[in-house]
Regions:
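Core dinuclear metal-dependent hydrolase active-site scaffold
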Residues: 2-37, 81-162, 225-228
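Short, hydrophobic beta-strand segments that form beta-sheet elements in well-ordered domains
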Residues: 5-8, 22-26, 42-44, 64-73, ...
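Active-site environment of divalent metal-dependent phosphoester hydrolases
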Residues: 30-33, 48-52, 74-78, 89-91, ...
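Short amphipathic alpha-helical segments
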Residues: 36-37, 54-57, 81, 139-140, ...
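Short catalytic-loop micro-motif centered on adjacent basic/acidic residues
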Residues: 43, 98-100, 166-169, 194-196
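A short, acidic, amphipathic alpha-helical segment used as a generic capping/interface helix at domain edges
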Residues: 150-156, 175-184
């Protein structure tokens, strides 16, 4: 049986731990233990302060096999173990293959295919970063129509994809449009488990999401999170 342990850290930060590797996405703050007995892959979707903390480069101490997969808007010193990716790129690291999608805000979203020693099947993980359906009433009709098109176009890459674990924004600041991004995503992919993120500490929005009539077809696949 595949060992895959998903841990919510804070905001949009998650770790996904396998027997033979660990992935970390958009670490901002919170408790995390970096293992020394397996490779660690650290993903950063863009440079916004709530998705990127330079502390991640301090994890690179002796004995840790670590690689950084960074959006190319991040100003990081070049190093052999740092890979910068723009939107719509593909990167093959052997047992990990990464596709990037163009964000509707800054940077990229990540679609990661993983070959672990425990499973003949690839494991697929999607982390949206700030790729979301950002509908702001105050921005007006033209902006919001463009946002809708940009979001739906970006997700065409994911159409029908089987995804084991997805991390998708559910932002309470969007008011009644808070669920539009996750709803479109879930209706256009074959995702087994989706974790809400980017909630700014307002975790009760998840209860609203679970009661939202539109989420009925996939409600049992939504995994509620709480900051540790």
């Amino acid at each position: 049986r595949l060992h895959m342990n998903v841990t919510y850290i804070q905001h949009s930060g998650f770790s996904v731990d396998f027997a033979d590797m660990m992935l970390v996405f958009d670490y901002w703050m919170g408790e995390i233990t970096i293992p020394e007995d397996k490779p660690v892959y650290v993903f950063v979707s863009h440079a916004h302060h709530d998705h990127f903390n330079e502390e991640i480069f301090e994890w690179e101490r002796s004995g840790v096999d670590i690689r950084y997969i960074l959006s190319d808007d991040i100003n990081a010193d070049p190093a052999e173990n740092r890979i910068l990716l723009g939107p719509d790129e593909f990167c093959d690291l052997g047992n990990i293959k990464i596709k990037t999608l163009r964000s509707t805000d800054e940077g990229v979203a990540f679609f990661v295919s993983i070959q672990t020693s425990e499973s003949a099947q690839e494991v697929h993980i999607y982390h949206a970063g700030d790729l979301n359906w950002w509908h702001w009433e105050e921005e007006g009709t033209e902006y919001n129509q463009q946002m809708k098109e940009d979001y739906q176009n970006a997700l065409r890459l994911m159409e029908g994809e089987h995804v084991d674990v997805a991390f998708v924004p559910v932002d309470p600041r969007l008011e009644d449009a808070y669920y539009w991004g996750i709803d479109w995503y879930m209706r256009h992919t074959d995702t087994e488990r989706v974790y809400p993120m980017h909630m700014w500490g307002q975790y009760e929005i998840q209860d609203r999401l679970l009661c939202q009539p539109e989420t009925a077809p996939y409600r049992e696949r939504i995994v509620k999170v709480m900051a540790s």
